[in-house]
Structures are given as structure tokens and as C-alpha cells.
Amino acid sequence: IVGGMEATPHSWPHQVA
């Protein structure tokens, strides 16, 4: 997960890896 908020699953718009 590369989004910065890997601790929050619902914070990923497209980063569901």
C-alpha cells in the first residue's frame, strides 16, 4: 500500500493492495 495512510483501509481510493 502506497498512500501514506496504510493504517486506514477506507482511505485508499484505488490502493487496495
From Swiss-Prot:
Extract the GO molecular function terms from the UniProt entry. serine-type peptidase activity
The answer to whether the entry has keyword Protein biosynthesis is: no
Q: Subcellular location, in the record's words?
A: Secreted, Extracellular space
Keywords for the protein's UniProt record, in alphabetical order = Collagen degradation, Hydrolase, Protease, Secreted, Serine protease
Q: How does activity depend on pH?
A: Optimum pH is 7-8.
Q: Does the keyword Protease apply?
A: yes
EC number(s) given by UniProt: 3.4.21.32
Q: What is this protein called?
A: Collagenolytic protease
Q: Which organism is it from?
A: Carcinus maenas (Common shore crab)
